[in-house]
């Protein structure tokens, strides 16, 4: 009697703790089935397809809604909780990890595409072009990246990014200019028949989208400042800590809707795709990209984690399953960030002082999957054009793909723009980016999964490397009440019956009956 009852309790506990994950998996399967059936047996108009995907659109809007408060509150509280020297060390370790894994991903992608040669058996004319090629200047894109790191208006940075465009100056424009015009004039030589120079003026514009890079830079500095202000800054620390907790409560509500939204996202995308024949034409190219992403996520990242942390990396990855599924469905590292926080902190028990500092930065600059994809795509397009790349050009692709992926968050319409930058760096025709746009929506989902997994492993690795500094801060927090994550020991109800440390809601939680000063960590 005892054993069946215990098995029943274990099953109920498993379902209770993993109902969201299981329902998401079921939603993915149902979404694929419904999408295929609707595509085969109904003839929906473009308007009908738009309405069909509406529940999925609502999920995306809700997730994007919490990105801004989550990034701002988590970055500020995370940095304020750390000593400036400690935060510098943690930041350096995180950036080194991001840089090394991105370089490894690029090298892996180039090795695979050079070995498999997916573009050798095909010609440019055999593949249909989709979309248009954006006009991109590498210099302007890099300068825009730096400009966006230092926004001139903090409120505007919450919904717009700075972007420069070039406009050709004609003779009539030149005579009509007045003294109040603020645009900068640049002169460049172009290959025209008269072999004359053309004049361009650089015009600054703003495009829609959160300036994540600028907000992170500001929050980093702001968090360091209020962390050093002592008791004067404590009220701000408490405010942003409460904002972070409130945002995560909202995330819990959103995740209850997630299975339904994901079902319609998947089904809607399957119905929307016009030409499935393109997948056959670009099949070998897709296999090359997916093979690289699989090797990087299943072999390289877990190996790095195991070498540093000395724990089972696949158990850690299992704790991130919900975040990885979300990334696969919605194809956005930033929109997945709320789920990534929950998985890292509640499933894998990573220190909040690490996750709140490392994850927002990782979601912005750590793009292993994107770097690998861009390197493979550049060499693939070179093979389509029968262009033999030299060692110098391959190195150029590697460096450019790494830099472009790191700076992608600070560049408006980053996907196409960064790809054009990589192609232009080695003299490949920028318009050939339209050859791979048709399958980009699918590959983008898988490379987002790799990006999120890399961020997650990064928190575990940085936490291990920073263990000594965190323990020293735990000791000093007994006399330093400024730390918003002052240590409280909590016994976690798990099978190991070990006493683990939980960083809960601030250093003033003395009376646990006080709902304002004490908040329990919620579970899935």
Swiss-Prot record:
A molecular function (GO) term: chloride transmembrane transporter activity
TM ranges: 19-38, 62-82, 94-114, 206-229, 239-266, 287-308, 354-380, 441-462
Cytoplasmic side: 1-18, 83-93, 230-238, 309-313, 345-353, 463-524
Ranges of the Extracellular topological domain: 39-61, 115-205, 267-286, 381-393, 428-440
GO cellular component, one term: neuron projection
PROSITE patterns documented for this protein: NA_DICARBOXYL_SYMP_1, NA_DICARBOXYL_SYMP_2
One record GO biological process: chloride transmembrane transport
Binding-site list for Na(+) 1: 98, 101-102, 362, 366, 368, 451, 455
Cysteines engaged in disulfide bonds, as pairs: none
Catalysed conversion reaction: K(+)(in) + L-glutamate(out) + 3 Na(+)(out) + H(+)(out) = K(+)(out) + L-glutamate(in) + 3 Na(+)(in) + H(+)(in); K(+)(in) + L-aspartate(out) + 3 Na(+)(out) + H(+)(out) = K(+)(out) + L-aspartate(in) + 3 Na(+)(in) + H(+)(in); D-aspartate(out) + K(+)(in) + 3 Na(+)(out) + H(+)(out) = D-aspartate(in) + K(+)(out) + 3 Na(+)(in) + H(+)(in); K(+)(in) + L-cysteine(out) + 3 Na(+)(out) + H(+)(out) = K(+)(out) + L-cysteine(in) + 3 Na(+)(in) + H(+)(in)
Topological type in the membrane: Multi-pass membrane protein
Residues annotated as binding L-aspartate: 331, 333, 370, 411, 447-448, 451
Localization (cell): Cell membrane; Apical cell membrane; Synapse, Synaptosome; Early endosome membrane
Keyword field contains Transport: yes
Subunit record text: Homotrimer. Interacts with ARL6IP5. Interacts with RTN2 (via N-terminus); the interaction promotes cell surface expression of SLC1A1. Interacts with SORCS2; this interaction is important for normal expression at the cell membrane.
Swiss-Prot/TrEMBL domain comment: Contains eight transmembrane regions plus two helical hairpins that dip into the membrane. These helical hairpin structures play an important role in the transport process. The first enters the membrane from the cytoplasmic side, the second one from the extracellular side. During the transport cycle, the regions involved in amino acid transport, and especially the helical hairpins, move vertically by about 15-18 Angstroms, alternating between exposure to the aqueous phase and reinsertion in the lipid bilayer. In contrast, the regions involved in trimerization do not move.
Additional facts recorded: Transport does not depend on chloride.
Protein name: Excitatory amino acid transporter 3
Organism listed in the record: Oryctolagus cuniculus
């Amino acid at each position: 009697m005892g054993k069946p009852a215990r098995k029943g309790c274990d099953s109920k506990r498993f379902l209770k703790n993993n109902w969201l994950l299981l329902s998401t998996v079921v939603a993915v399967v149902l979404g694929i089935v419904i999408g295929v059936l609707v595509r085969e047996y109904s003839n929906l108009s473009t308007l009908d397809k738009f309405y069909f995907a509406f529940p999925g659109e609502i999920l995306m809007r809700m997730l994007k809604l919490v990105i801004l408060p989550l990034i701002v509150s988590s970055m500020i509280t995370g940095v304020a909780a750390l000593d400036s020297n400690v935060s510098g060390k943690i930041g350096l370790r995180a950036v080194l990890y991001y840089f090394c894994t991105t370089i490894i991903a690029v090298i892996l992608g180039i090795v695979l595409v050079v070995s498999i040669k997916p573009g050798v058996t095909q010609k440019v004319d055999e593949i249909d072009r989709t979309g248009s090629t954006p006009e991109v200047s590498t210099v302007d894109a890099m300068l825009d990246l730096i400009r966006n790191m230092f926004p001139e208006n903090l409120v505007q940075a919450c919904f717009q990014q700075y972007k420069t465009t070039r406009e050709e100056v004609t003779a009539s424009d030149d005579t009509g200019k007045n003294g109040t015009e603020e645009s900068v004039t640049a002169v460049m030589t172009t290959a025209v028949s008269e072999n004359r120079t053309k004049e361009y003026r650089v015009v600054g514009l703003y495009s829609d989208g959160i300036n994540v890079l600028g907000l992170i830079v500001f929050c980093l500095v702001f968090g360091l400042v209020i962390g050093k202000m002592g008791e004067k800054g404590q009220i701000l620390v408490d405010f942003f800590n409460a904002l972070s907790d409130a945002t995560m409560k909202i995330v819990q509500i959103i995740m209850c809707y997630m299975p339904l939204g994901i079902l319609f996202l998947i089904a809607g995308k399957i119905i929307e795709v016009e030409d499935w024949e393109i997948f056959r034409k670009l099949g070998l190219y897709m296999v090359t990209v997916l093979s690289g992403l699989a090797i990087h996520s299943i072999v390289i990242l877990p190996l790095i984690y195991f070498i540093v942390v000395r724990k089972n990396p696949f158990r850690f990855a299992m704790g991130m399953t919900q975040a990885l599924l979300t990334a696969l469905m919605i194809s956005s590292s930033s929109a997945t960030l709320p789920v990534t926080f929950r998985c890292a902190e509640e499933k894998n028990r990573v220190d909040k002082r690490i996750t709140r500092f490392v994850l927002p930065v990782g979601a912005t600059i750590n793009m292993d999957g994107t770097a690998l994809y861009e390197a493979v795509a550049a060499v693939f397009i070179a093979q389509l054009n029968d262009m033999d790349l030299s060692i110098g050009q391959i190195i150029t692709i590697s460096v450019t793909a790494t830099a472009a992926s790191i700076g992608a968050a600070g560049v408006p319409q980053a996907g196409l723009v960064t790809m054009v930058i990589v192609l232009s760096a080695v003299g490949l025709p920028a318009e050939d980016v339209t050859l791979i746009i048709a399958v980009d929506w699918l590959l983008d989902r898988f490379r987002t999964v790799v990006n999120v997994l890399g961020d997650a492993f990064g928190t575990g690795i940085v936490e291990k490397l920073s263990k000594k500094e965190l323990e020293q801060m735990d000791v000093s927090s007994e006399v330093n009440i400024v730390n918003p994550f002052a240590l409280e020991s909590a016994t976690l109800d798990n099978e190991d019956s070990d006493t683990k440390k939980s960083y809960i809601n601030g250093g003033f939680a003395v009376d646990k009956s006080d709902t304002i000063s004490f908040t329990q960590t919620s579970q899935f």
